[in-house]
Amino acid sequence: MRGGESIDTSMGLTPLEGLVMGTRCGDLDPAIPFYLAKNLGMDNQALDDLLNRRSGLLGLCGVNDMREIYRRIAQGDPTVVLALDVFCHRLRKYLGAYWIELGRLDALVFTGGIGENDAVVRARTCAGLEGMGILLDEAANQSVGKGERRVSRSESPVAVLVIPTNEELEIARQTLEAVGG
């Protein structure tokens, strides 16, 4: 956001572009669907199903529930470690791209299910980004809380915030605006 206006999104025409998600692939080499069609005989419907519903975390490690991922990490499963590495790497990659596009960063906001509830993903995303002015407060990050909260250190040039989302309320607001209410 710049001046209250969105300047970009990680999604393209569809949510397939961008970040790795629970079941969606995120960015991938455009030749992959052609390769799969040619070498595995996959048709358009099979490719759509694979990329939208059987990829992402699910495709990388077999599960898309972060609780199960952490349970399996504790058991030493290397596939879930890889999946979490890929997930956080993509977050950091997009964060860096947006930082460059904006020219500076005032705040890094974590929202949505994982952003609001997963201290490990927040910590791994922020790790090593002190040069960007992101100084995470580990204790604040680990604390469980509801509502908006700051999880960066007080001296952090960039505020790191956890802000709960209310998608239903936003949909209702936009619907009301669209119908002229």
Enumerate the language-model features and the residues they cover.
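A mobile "lid/hinge" subdomain adjacent to the ATP/sugar-phosphate binding pocket shared
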Residues: 40-83
